[in-house]
Amino acid sequence: MAEVRWIYDLTIFLYAASVLFYFNDFLQSNRKVNRLAFGLLVVVWALQTAFFVSQAVMKGYFPVITLFETLFFYSWVLVGLSLAIHYFFRIDLLVFLPNIIGFVVLVMSMFLPETPIEAVSSILTSELLLTHVTLAMFSYGAFSLSMIFSAMYLLQHKMLKGRRWSPLLRRLPSLDQLEGYAYRMNMLGVPMLLLSIVLGIIWGKMVLGEKFLLDSKVLLSELVLAIYSLWLYQRYRIRCRCADSSQWNVLAFLLLLINFLGFTTSTFHDWW
């Protein structure tokens, strides 16, 4: 780890600079600063990829097992998605906001252990479990973007109701676009989370038996999946497009975060 630690440290430094430049562009709408922020973000993603690959080579498994590894991978997913947003949508605010989350997550990973406990690492590095965690992280990335779209919807809705015209309002996509983007992200996230839970249950029954089924993290994951599935049902069948739907989406993501970071309540996620 020491050999590539400089990559991790440099990544955090450049990521902080990129977020600060994006914040400056958010306040002053400076195109030169925006291009600099985007260039730094590309470098950050490349460094994260290099660090991730080096960890996989050194550890001999796909590094998404410990909380350090999953937070790092989650941050990598968010950076990658924000770059895709820049390419397809060219909406700068949609690049800035996900990377606030991504940077905070990456900084959190600094304070966590980097290597799984040797006694259980052989069990934890099974392909089934690695696929389970990877799908979960990609679904979290999709839900993160969906939450941001819904939060922007609520902000714009409030500004329009209050007739508060500002430069920020002009930089936001329309309400219909924001709602549509949130819907598409949830359409991506729900199947991935479903597959992740199914694979996790299969792995749990093989390794832990029946005792894990009443674990708080398992139950809360199923609740999160049910909430997002119901949200999609209302959006598709009832055509519910309103501020209440966006509020529900934001609250669902908060529950997702509680489930993800509230690892101490779980009886078998103790290796994190």
From Swiss-Prot:
Entry GO MF terms: heme binding
Recorded GO CC terms: plasma membrane
Subcellular location: Cell membrane
InterPro entries assigned to the protein according to its UniProt record, in alphabetical order: Cyt_c_assembly, YpjD/HemX
Keywords on record: Cell membrane, Membrane, Porphyrin biosynthesis, Transmembrane, Transmembrane helix
GO biological process, one term: porphyrin-containing compound biosynthetic process
Pfam families tied to this protein: Cytochrom_C_asm
Domain of life: Bacteria
Disulfide bonds: none
Transmembrane parts of this sequence: 7-27, 38-58, 65-85, 93-113, 135-155, 188-208, 212-232, 248-268
Coiled coil, from the record: none
Membrane topology: Multi-pass membrane protein
Role, per record: Required for HemL synthesis.
Name of the protein: Protein HemX
